[in-house]
Swiss-Prot record:
The keyword Phosphoprotein applies. This is Zinc finger CCCH-type with G patch domain-containing protein. Residues 115-126 have a biased composition (Acidic residues). Interacts with CHD4/Mi-2; the interaction is direct. It comes from Ovis aries. The modification Phosphoserine is found at residues 278, 355. GO terms for cellular component: nucleoplasm; nucleus; plasma membrane. The lineage of its organism: Eukaryota, Metazoa, Chordata, Craniata, Vertebrata.
């Protein structure tokens, strides 16, 4: 929204607020008064937000007007800046100056030359003139990436290689090591080189670039950006919504929550230069701060026989997203030249609790069995199960169990248990039946507890609605009656299961020794 629409909306909200205040003074019903007070609070909050948006728009227009007053100076500023630095850094030294230094000190103070005083004055004036000037300075991160940040000159110093340089403080720090130390400029920092904040960085004059004002016109919903948080650092984020000069951003880090920031707390990404820059004459291809772009026909992508990221149906799918963030194009090979492997690495699930030697033996056995193509022979029957096998040894307890269960002492009848079934197998069968009874009994008890909780909730609701709504009370009474019937059925089912369980225990005690 522009300034005029915000002013119109502000006048409308003021008129509505006056009408609401008049209605409050008219003496209405208590129910209507509560709604009017709520509406009054909402209108006041809306007026405050609209006024804040109007102030933000006016501030941005004022800053744009101040920046547009000197376009000619900005074009000539980089050359003048470099010339001034070179002039202040390259001070002419006479051939015999070094040799004459010691005798002059020994003989005491002598008359100072006017040219020397002028040179010292020019050095001080040049350093003072450069201090506070904004530039675009390089920064090498800990992992070797070159980035250009907007910075401010705080003084002139000689670079490590002896060339003229300046000490700069970065204006938009993205790391804690770039954040300016609050005590450095005042000379009160006690940690000096061990300080975890930045005391400035010495940069060669040849590496400096002109200062670039952040261009917010290209930012829209879905654009990548840098957003400032309360700790003073700028984090990579993505814009999700733009409304009246306010930007809703979602940070790339999952540890940071979504935030709403103004225009002075948001920047375009640092690694993107404007498309129409005057010095982009093909030298960007050799710039180490930019990734090498592979032409569509330059790489020969291999054929992939399996679906890319097909394994992620079993995972959360973070692998393919990380590859896409690092610039990988689906169907091409890995590596900066897209000449790496195309086939994904297939996962092999090994048996749990086995060593690598045992896993290798298992794989070898499977390979041999597959190559031989011979099916495994069926397992032999247990001894005594065939017609010619010896019968298992029988004890007096087996004889008593057969007699008490009604079995014949001789050969088994048709439809009876298969031959060779011992008393231990019969005991295992009864144990599984008992386990099933216990499971059903446990499930029934859980249902009884749930029904009792539901009955208590319905009774509390009836107590709350007593004498208020007859329809609601009737419905709750019907629900209560249904829940009580269900509780009676569940209790009857529980009693039946308990009887069966006691019967099984009694049968086991009486029939097995």
């Amino acid at each position: 929204m522009d300034e005029e629409s915000l002013q119109t909306a502000l006048r409308t909200y003021d008129a509505q607020l006056q009408q609401v205040e008049l209605a409050l003074g008219a003496g209405l019903d208590p129910s209507e008064l509560a709604d009017l007070r709520q509406l009054q609070g909402d209108l006041k909050e809306l007026i405050e937000l609209t006024e804040a948006s109007l102030v933000s728009i006016r501030k941005s227009k004022l800053l744009a007007a101040l920046d547009g007053e000197r376009p000619v100076q900005e074009d000539a500023e980089p050359l003048a800046f470099q010339n001034a630095i070179v002039e202040t850094a390259e001070v002419p030294v006479a051939p015999g100056a070094e040799l004459e230094t010691v005798p002059s000190r020994e003989t005491g103070p002598g008359p100072t030359e006017p040219g020397q005083e002028e040179d010292d004055g020019e050095d001080e004036e040049g350093g003072a003139a450069l201090s506070g000037r904004k530039v675009n300075a390089p920064y090498y991160s800990a992992w070797g990436t070159l980035e250009y940040h907007n910075a401010m000159v705080v003084g002139t110093e000689e670079a490590d290689d002896g060339s003229p340089g300046v000490r700069v403080l970065y204006l938009y720090p993205t790391h804690k090591s770039l954040k300016p130390c609050p005590f450095f400029l005042e000379g009160k920092c006690r940690f000096q080189e061990n300080c975890r904040f930045s005391h400035g960085q010495v940069v060669s004059v040849d590496e400096l670039r002109p200062f670039q004002d952040p261009d917010l016109s290209s930012l829209q919903a879905g654009s990548a950006c840098l957003a400032k948080r309360q700790d003073g650092l700028w984090y990579p984020a993505r814009i999700t919504d733009v409304d009246s000069g306010y930007y809703t951003v979602k940070f790339d880090s999952l540890l940071l929550k979504e935030a709403v920031v103004e225009g002075d707390s948001i920047l375009p990404p640092l690694r993107t230069d404007p498309a129409g820059s005057s010095d982009s004459d093909g030298s960007d291809a050799d710039d180490p701060s930019y990734a090498r772009v592979v032409e569509p026909g330059a790489a020969n992508p291999g054929t992939c026989s399996s679906a890319f990221a097909g394994w992620e149906v079993h995972t959360r799918g973070i692998g393919s997203r990380l590859l896409a963030k690092m610039g990988y194009e689906f169907g091409k090979g890995l590596g900066r030249r897209a000449d790496g492997r195309v086939e994904p690495v297939h996962a092999v699930v090994l048996p749990r609790g086995k060593s690598l030697d045992q896993c290798a033996e298992i794989l070898q056995k499977r390979t041999r069995a597959g190559q031989a193509g011979v099916s495994k022979p069926p397992k032999c029957r247990s001894r005594g199960s065939g017609p010619g096998g010896r019968p298992p040894p029988r004890s007096v307890f087996d004889f008593l169990n057969e007699k008490l269960k009604g079995g014949a002492p001789g050969a088994p009848e048709v439809g009876a248990a298969p031959p060779g079934r011992s008393g231990k197998e019969v005991y295992h069968a009864s144990r599984s039946t008992k386990r099933a009874l216990s499971l059903r009994l446990l499930q029934t008890e859980e249902k009884i507890e749930q029904t009792q909780r539901a009955i208590r909730g319905i009774q509390e609701a009836l107590a709350r609605n007593a004498g208020r709504h007859s329809v609601t009370t009737t419905q709750l009474q019907e629900k209560l009656a249904g829940a009580q019937r269900q509780l009676g059925q569940l209790r009857a089912q529980e009693a039946g299961l308990q009887r069966e369980q006691r019967k099984a225990d009694t049968h086991k005690k009486m029939t097995e020794f």
